[in-house]
């Protein structure tokens, strides 16, 4: 068994059954590591539910977000497939999957911007600086990394409206194959310049409480309200 170190704030997000989740933290806090954990949890349990992973820019996506997430996947034995050097690999990136992968649920002319897993799971990837390119996609879960500078309207129009594929459910406080439909989105980002994060999550209402907690390595701010988790 591979032992994984997870912080209390990360555990709160991992265990959240709110549809809209925010992990707001500084550099080195494990934001993208958290994304790696959550993404593979969903990939493994719901192989027929498509996911979406994005960052604010393409360079952020390729050089930071996916790099860190794939590092996590590798740490638990989930490697990229290569016919010659890693035939036991479990995913391919931007290419047609090999015949040993499940693809009966695929219907793509081109696999650019797609991560395909051996169990059939598909993850769309992209950047939010070309948000309109995600129009028409449909997925069941989403992870948005470092999108603090992304405009709120782009997220509402091109992401939240696409977050509607069925297949993930919550029952008795656990992920399930039946029960209440669940389409979670996770924002993993550092403090925002755009006001939409403060407004969506009502952070201005908790300024004093936040200030009293965030400057210690032993405490953190946590709140659930409506359909949101911070």
Q: Residues of each region from the PLM?
A:
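Phosphate/NTP-binding elements of NTP-utilizing enzymes
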Residues: 1-230
């Amino acid at each position: 068994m591979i032992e994984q170190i997870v912080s209390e704030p990360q555990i709160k997000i991992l265990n959240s059954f709110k549809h809209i989740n925010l992990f707001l933290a500084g550099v080195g806090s494990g934001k993208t590591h958290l994304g790696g954990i959550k993404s593979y949890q969903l990939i493994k349990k719901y192989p027929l539910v498509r996911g979406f992973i994005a960052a604010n820019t393409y360079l952020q996506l390729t050089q930071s977000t996916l790099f860190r997430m794939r590092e996590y996947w590798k740490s638990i034995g989930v490697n990229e497939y290569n016919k010659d050097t890693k035939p036991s690999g479990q995913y391919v990136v931007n290419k047609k999957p090999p015949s040993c992968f499940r693809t009966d649920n695929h219907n793509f002319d081109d696999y650019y911007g797609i991560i395909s897993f051996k169990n059939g799971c598909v993850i769309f990837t992209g950047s939010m600086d070309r948000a309109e390119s995600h129009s028409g996609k449909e997925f069941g879960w989403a992870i948005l990394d470092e999108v603090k500078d992304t405009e709120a309207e782009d997220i509402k129009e091109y992401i939240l409206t696409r977050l509607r594929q069925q297949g993930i459910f919550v029952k008795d406080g656990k992920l399930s194959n039946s029960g209440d439909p669940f389409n979670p989105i996770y924002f993993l980002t550092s403090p925002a310049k755009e006001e939409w994060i403060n407004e969506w999550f009502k952070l201005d209402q908790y300024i004093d409480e936040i200030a009293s907690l965030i400057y210690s390595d032993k405490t953190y701010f946590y709140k659930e309200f409506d359909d949101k988790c911070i």
